[in-house]
Amino acid sequence: MSEFVTVARPYAKAAFDFAVEHQSVERWQDMLAFAAEVTKNEQMAELLSGALAPETLAESFIAVCGEQLDENGQNLIRVMAENNRLNALPDVLEQFIHLRAASEATSEVEVTSATALSEEQLSKISAAMEKRLSRKVKLNCKIDKSVMAGVIIRAGDMVIDGSVRGRLERLADVLQS
């Protein structure tokens, strides 16, 4: 986990509460995602680690973001710059997404397979995970040829490894012991 998670949580909570109150959760997530990407820019990273005055840093950051940030998003940037916390924006986004998922009773489920899965397979996985987790799921599919065949499903700290690679690794462990 990133060192900024504890720092990011109150900012994410404040942004999320504000977004819910103003029915703009999607817009806020988009603004935070854009601002988080800006912090990853090499030149911006140098500015963030430099000795600029917080007001100058905030205005420079806001200028780079342009119209991607509304007035309230700009205010968040100013507050975070004032407290030297702009580096925590990627973690603020991550915490915001977790808060949104919790409020919408959804879970992000990562499905890794060797080949693209059919719509039927994805709907079966989705239904099974919704039943198991007792909430709606959003599938994020990845293709990894090293899986060989089968799938690996990750939801939070739960991992279901139904891949050939996983079976071979478990077999190798048994044979070595």
UniProtKB/Swiss-Prot annotation:
InterPro entries given in the database record: ATP_synth_OSCP/delta_N_sf (IPR026015), ATPase_OSCP/d_CS (IPR020781), ATPase_OSCP/dsu (IPR000711)
Primary location class: membrane
GO biological process: proton motive force-driven ATP synthesis
One Pfam family linked to the record: OSCP
Gene3D superfamilies attached to this UniProt entry: N-terminal domain of the delta subunit of the F1F0-ATP synthase
Recorded GO CC terms: plasma membrane; proton-transporting ATP synthase complex
GO molecular function: proton-transporting ATP synthase activity, rotational mechanism
Compartments in which it is found: Cell inner membrane
Keywords: ATP synthesis, Cell inner membrane, Cell membrane, CF(1), Hydrogen ion transport, Ion transport, Membrane, Transport
Membrane topology designation: Peripheral membrane protein
UniProt function note: F(1)F(0) ATP synthase produces ATP from ADP in the presence of a proton or sodium gradient. F-type ATPases consist of two structural domains, F(1) containing the extramembraneous catalytic core and F(0) containing the membrane proton channel, linked together by a central stalk and a peripheral stalk. During catalysis, ATP synthesis in the catalytic domain of F(1) is coupled via a rotary mechanism of the central stalk subunits to proton translocation. This protein is part of the stalk that links CF(0) to CF(1). It either transmits conformational changes from CF(0) to CF(1) or is implicated in proton conduction.
Subunit composition and interactions: F-type ATPases have 2 components, F(1) - the catalytic core - and F(0) - the membrane proton channel. F(1) has five subunits: alpha(3), beta(3), gamma(1), delta(1), epsilon(1). F(0) has three main subunits: a(1), b(2) and c(10-14). The alpha and beta chains form an alternating ring which encloses part of the gamma chain. F(1) is attached to F(0) by a central stalk formed by the gamma and epsilon chains, while a peripheral stalk is formed by the delta and b chains.
Similarity annotation: Belongs to the ATPase delta chain family.
Name of the protein described by the UniProt record: ATP synthase subunit delta
Gene name tied to this protein: atpH
